[in-house]
Each structure stands twice: as structure tokens, then as C-alpha cells.
């Protein structure tokens, strides 16, 4: 069996009620999509442990979940703030030009002039488009520590090469 690669897709929040329910914070594009990716793993004391989802529902505008074996508030409290992960193998293949954020994080960003702008450290969602957060190297000639580059495929992002972990952008190094 191949080694699992776990990607964080959410986090458990505070307890809800006395029967072992927990609030859920999903980092998937659509909050309910987190339930499409099973099984879940929780990071407990630095180790990923598989858990089974028993039930979920909306309470007001929050998602709440019940995990198997979590029957009371005290047991649920042990899981508060635990990250929720899933094996990357459960993610569906995307169409060309679409990328999962976890594939872009860690890529080197280079502009059309060949200037190494830094490494993608995270992604941000804005109302109109996603944004690459690029941390510059310590010897950045423009004195930049971080750049925010819109992920506009073809307009700004010219090429994504996941094999070499390189993103080529049409972006002035001074910005």
C-alpha cells in the first residue's frame, strides 16, 4: 500500500451541546464539500488518526459534526482545534488549467524576465480571484519580503509546471 499524503481540509472548533457534537470549520471551496472527502484523519498530538463521521448538519450558519465514539461533551472537548485531513488520493482529477491550492504551495515563482520572485507560501481567496502569497528570498533585489500576485490564468499566470514546481507570471518584480 502506498504511503498516504494527508492534506488539511478543515478544523474542529468548540463543542456544541452535551452529546459530543463539535463545530466544524471547512477550508474547502464550498463548506459542505468537506463531507465528500472520506475518510477523515484528525491530527492529535502530532499524529494523524483516522476517524469516522457519524452525522453532520447546519446549526444556524455553522456546520456541526458528530464523530463515531464521541458520545459526550468531555470526549468531544479532547478534539477541539484538531485539524481535519484527508488522503490526497481521494481528490478528483482536475481539468487542465485548474489546480488544487496544495499543488501550488511550495512552487517557485519566476516572472517573464526570469527573475526569481520567491516561493508560494499560501493562497488567499478574495471576492474576484485567488491570490498567490509569494515569500521572497532574503536577497530580493527590490527589498520585497512578500508579494501578492493574483492567480489569473493566462492574464497574469502564464505557466504552471507542477513537475518542476515552477509558476511563470507576467508580473513586475518591483510590485
From Swiss-Prot:
Main localisation: cytoplasm
Family recorded in the similarity comment: Belongs to the RimM family.
Protein's name according to its UniProt entry: Ribosome maturation factor RimM
This protein's UniProt keywords: Chaperone, Cytoplasm, Ribosome biogenesis, rRNA processing
Domain notes from UniProt: The PRC barrel domain binds ribosomal protein uS19.
Function (record text): An accessory protein needed during the final step in the assembly of 30S ribosomal subunit, possibly for assembly of the head region. Essential for efficient processing of 16S rRNA. May be needed both before and after RbfA during the maturation of 16S rRNA. It has affinity for free ribosomal 30S subunits but not for 70S ribosomes.
GO cellular component annotations of the record: cytoplasm; ribosome
Compartment list: Cytoplasm
Amino acid at each position: 500500500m502506498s504511503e498516504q499524503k494527508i492534506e488539511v481540509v478543515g478544523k474542529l472548533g468548540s463543542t456544541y451541546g452535551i452529546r459530543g457534537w463539535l463545530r466544524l470549520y471547512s477550508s474547502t471551496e464550498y463548506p459542505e464539500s468537506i463531507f465528500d472527502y472520506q475518510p477523515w484523519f484528525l491530527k492529535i498530538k502530532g499524529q494523524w488518526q483516522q476517524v469516522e463521521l457519524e452525522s453532520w448538519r447546519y446549526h444556524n450558519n455553522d456546520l456541526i459534526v458528530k464523530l463515531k465514539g464521541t458520545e459526550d461533551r468531555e470526549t468531544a472537548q479532547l478534539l477541539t482545534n484538531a485539524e481535519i485531513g484527508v488522503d490526497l488520493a481521494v481528490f478528483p482529477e482536475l481539468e487542465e488549467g485548474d489546480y488544487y491550492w496544495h499543488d501550488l504551495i511550495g512552487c517557485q515563482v519566476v516572472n517573464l524576465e526570469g527573475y526569481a520572485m520567491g516561493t508560494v507560501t499560501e493562497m488567499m481567496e478574495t471576492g474576484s480571484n485567488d491570490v498567490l502569497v509569494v515569500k521572497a528570498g532574503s536577497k530580493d533585489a527590490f527589498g520585497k519580503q512578500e508579494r501578492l500576485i493574483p492567480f489569473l490564468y493566462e492574464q497574469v499566470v502564464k505557466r504552471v509546471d507542477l513537475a518542476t514546481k515552477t509558476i511563470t507570471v507576467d508580473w513586475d518584480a518591483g510590485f
